[in-house]
Design a protein with these regions (language model features):
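Feature captures the catalytic ectodomains and active-site-proximal regions of enzymes
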Residues: 1-384
Length: 384
């Protein structure tokens, strides 16, 4: 019987502040805990049954009677973004924080971007992704200039209306930006953000594309591939790793699409590793401080978890549910928050133990489950 492993990342579902959260302006952050309080209690029967309420105190989600392995994980390196969170889950630790641009990008970067794309630049400052198209979209349509902005994360984003800048041209512009944003100006990601509509009703499309840096070293994805284990990603994870260590990438720009893609792989995959990102708790609800929407997204995920656990064979399959960082929608800011993340791990013989450790324990456990070995050169201790 060939084994399989599934790691599901609930994007931005942080599980409480870290000792250094205050250094990032995130003292007291607790994404899941505060959503639970603000929602009047979480209604997540399947995640509760597995042990989410055993991992951390959550209103409406009491400790499970018979939990699987549960606990909280912490990052080993700096940062609080998608890139570093996913990299750390697979054992790649960034020794220094990726560069951010709280005052916008320097003049030489903007000049190179103008020269390389043949278009002007609007905005050039940290901005909410939805607000920036509301505030600059009309001028963009009038001038054809690209909307270039950043956030508290290490990212350069380019927004453009699909009727003004075709998708292929927008991606080409992002490729120009990716080459510029290396070396001293390196950012974790360059992101294409197409949008549609008319002034007052602009909305992002699902044509987002991420152009990342390569991970800073070998990862557990590389270890799995070296052992002949097929690696699959669902959603944005393939691009987060700049496609390094990934055999097959499956679409998942929305939670329904990523859930459906994961369900398909559960039904069809004979052997391998599936690494899924469920993005909407971050992209749609966390950054927009929408607590009811955040809870609804968790409930949609919970229903999928019920279907997945019914379909999986604990003797054959490892299921890990975790996150990459926080994005507490009850705090004044709209940026990510530096937090612990939850850990739920279901497999035969789990014993209901508590396990607290670094993010990299996830990758170490996947390698142990699928290859029966450890990678001495990578951080992480299996919780199997």
């Amino acid at each position: 019987m060939q084994r399989r492993a599934f790691v599901i990342v609930l994007d931005a579902c942080g599980a409480g502040e870290l000792p250094d959260s205050a250094d990032y302006g995130d003292a007291g952050a607790n994404t899941l805990g505060h959503v639970a309080e603000a929602a009047g209690g979480l209604v997540l029967p399947n995640l509760q049954r597995l042990g989410l309420g055993s991992a951390l105190a959550l209103r409406g989600c009491p400790p499970a009677e018979r939990p699987v392995v549960h606990g909280r994980l912490h990052p080993m390196g700096p940062g609080k973004d998608t890139i570093t969170g996913h990299w750390e889950l697979m054992g790649a630790i960034t020794p220094v924080a990726l560069r951010t641009y709280p005052d916008g990008f320097p003049a030489d970067v903007i000049e190179q971007l103008r020269d390389g794309t043949g278009r002007g630049v609007l905005c050039n400052k940290p901005y909410s992704g939805t607000a920036v198209i509301d505030d600059y979209g009309e001028e963009h349509l009038r001038t054809g200039d690209l909307i270039v902005y950043t956030s508290a994360d290490s990212v350069l984003q380019i927004a453009a209306h699909e009727d003004e800048v075709p998708q292929a041209e927008l991606i080409a512009a992002c490729q120009v930006a990716r080459e510029i944003m290396r070396g001293e100006h390196a950012v974790g990601r360059v992101i294409a953000r197409p949008f549609r509509g008319v002034p007052g009703t602009f909305e992002r499309t699902e044509g987002r594309k991420d152009l990342a840096l390569d991970p800073p070293g070998r990862t557990y994805l590389d270890e799995l591939r070296a052992d002949g284990v097929p690696t699959h990603t669902v959603g944005k994870i393939g691009s987060v790793f700049n496609h390094v260590g990934v055999d097959h990438e499956h679409p998942g720009a929305t939670n329904p699409a990523a859930i459906a893609g994961t369900s398909r792989l559960i039904d069809e995959l004979e052997h391998g590793f599936v690494f899924t990102n469920l993005v909407e708790t971050d992209q749609v609800y966390g950054h927009r401080q929408d607590v009811p929407g955040f809870h609804r997204a968790l409930q949609e995920i919970d229903r999928a978890v019920g279907e997945w656990t019914a379909a999986l064979d604990p003797e054959r399959d490892l299921l890990v549910i975790t996150a990459d960082h926080g994005c507490d929608p009850t705090t004044p800011g709209t940026d990510h928050t530096r937090e612990h993340v939850p850990l739920i791990a279901a497999f035969a013989g789990h014993g209901g133990r508590r396990h607290d450790g670094p993010f990299a324990d996830v990758g170490a456990s996947v390698l142990r489950w699928l290859s029966g070995r450890e990678a001495d050169s990578l951080p992480g201790t299996p919780f199997l």
